[in-house]
Design a protein with these regions (language model features):
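TRNA-recognition modules of translation machinery and tRNA-sensing kinases, especially anticodon-binding
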Residues: 1-461
Length: 461
């Protein structure tokens, strides 16, 4: 006999149950409505992708790729297993081992891959897409942070000709950035999320903008690295490693012991080239035109290598140290890095888990949604009428509970109360024979008579 075992969800994952899923549905449906009003369409992406996609897009030296991704070899399919001339079993094994896939840790790279694969550069530009779904990172689980977590995000991608003069598109790029930020702030407002704070910054660019001048970030990074070397012994292990791999990431440290050191480091805002400074000034002007309140945070950087110029982060109160609910920025050049045509891009990702938590902390979670109508039928001759009534009410949009077997009157009302029903439709043989049905309002105990053809109107009154 097999050993009895109680299975549980893996650490860092959890089940989402009613009534909490009612809130999740509202958060996601609100995104569809708000993003749709800005002209965005939904894209649905694979859960796993080639590991190389994330290594190239996110950066091979980032924590996400080097330590946090769930990666595994892709087994050869039946065609690969067929003998191919002198191909040996060892070669097949090596081929399988060299093809590695990863559960997606983020979705921007996947959206860019889809943009290239489906020739979206030939569509009317820009292409506006949004997505939602689970992501996966092997992180230490804590409040608001899981190994399987959920994101809602949006991307704006625009293919352009290689000879475009970047100095002439600065205003347009800034307007797109501002509209994307306006959209996500409108989304949080529609949700009723409280204590929302928008921080913005510009991090210049590490590669020439499409049709633009050489990078302005390199000189700053070198200066930052030199300053970090002077205080290296006072930094934690992760920050010491980042001095060599990506010095900008040190500015993103959340360690309390490092904050004073970070405050004394050079600021990238003091090293922007003329074009990046002009772009940043125009982003701020556009936000002000749209009535979007913001705070400049000159230490703000993003944790992914592909970002340039505009970066932003949105926080919400009541979440402690894990209070960021959204992050995003501009990433011109990422599509080209992945093999596509020169393309500009900006996007963001919302941490849905943290948004849900923030709403719950503010008392805006979903209460259990009961049934609208409980049908208490008594007597075999009433069953057909009860089934017809349930069908008609459901088609009219009511949540209906029809018990599979008849119940005594008192038990039926007790069950209706447990399910949170608003009304009990009482169908006995007398009601069916007379054509007048009894409807009991459970909140106050009042009841009335109604004919079948008037039932829906009576309940909607």
């Amino acid at each position: 006999m097999a050993e009895k075992r109680n299975f549980q969800a893996i650490k860092g994952t959890r089940d989402l149950l009613p009534p909490e899923t009612e809130l999740w549905n509202r958060v996601e449906q609100t995104a569809r409505e708000v993003f749709g009003s800005f002209g965005f369409g939904e894209i649905r992406l694979p859960i796993f992708e080639p590991t190389e996609l994330f290594a190239r897009a996110v950066g091979g030296e980032t924590d996400i790729v080097s330590k946090e991704m769930y990666t595994f070899p892709e087994a050869p399919d039946s065609e690969e297993m067929k003998p191919l001339g002198s191909t040996t079993a060892d070669l097949i094994i090596r081929r399988a081992a060299s093809t590695r896939v990863s559960l997606r840790p983020e979705a921007t790279a996947s959206v860019c891959r889809a943009y290239i694969e489906h020739g979206m550069h030939a569509l009317a530009q820009p292409v506006k897409l949004y997505y939602m779904g689970p992501m996966f990172r092997r992180e230490r689980p804590q409040k608001g942070r899981y190994r399987q977590f959920y994101q809602i995000g949006a991307e704006v991608l625009e293919a352009i000709t290689p000879n475009t003069d970047a100095t002439k598109t600065i205003g347009k790029d800034a307007a797109v950035d501002a509209e994307v930020i306006e959209m996500v702030m409108a989304y949080f407002a529609r949700l009723g999320l409280e204590g929302v704070q928008l921080d913005i910054n510009s991090i210049g660019h590490s590669a020439p903008p499409i049709g633009g001048k050489p990078e302005c970030r390199r000189g700053y990074v070198e200066k930052l690295k030199n300053e970090l070397e002077k205080v290296k012994d006072k930094l934690g292990a992760d920050s010491q490693r980042r001095i060599e791999t990506n010095p900008l990431r040190v500015l993103d440290s959340k360690l309390e012991s490092e904050q004073e050191i970070i405050a004394g480091l050079p600021r990238i805002g003091d090293h922007l080239c003329a074009d990046c400074a002009k772009h940043y000034a125009e982003v701020k002007r556009q936000l002000e035109l749209r009535g979007v309140a913001y705070r400049e945070n000159r230490r703000l950087v993003r944790g992914l290598d592909y970002y340039m110029r505009t970066t932003f982060e949105i926080t919400a109160r009541g979440l402690g140290s894990q209070n960021a609910v959204c992050g995003g920025g501009r990433y011109d050049g990422l599509v080209e890095l992945l093999g596509g045509a020169p393309t500009k891009g900006i996007g963001f990702a919302i941490g849905e888990d943290r948004v849900i938590l923030s709403l719950q902390e503010a008392g805006k979670g979903s209460a259990a949604q009961g049934r609208d109508v409980y049908i208490a039928w008594m007597g075999e001759k009433t069953l057909a009428t009860a089934i017809r009534a349930a069908r008609d009410l459901r088609q009219a949009g009511f949540r209906v509970e029809l018990p599979p077997v008849e119940q005594k009157f008192g038990k039926a009302l007790g069950q209706a109360d447990k399910l949170g029903a608003r009304y009990a439709l009482i169908l006995g043989e007398d009601e069916v024979a007379s054509g007048e049905w009894t409807v009991k309002t459970l909140a106050d105990g009042t009841q009335g008579k109604v004919r079948e053809e008037g039932l829906v109107a009576y309940l909607k009154r």
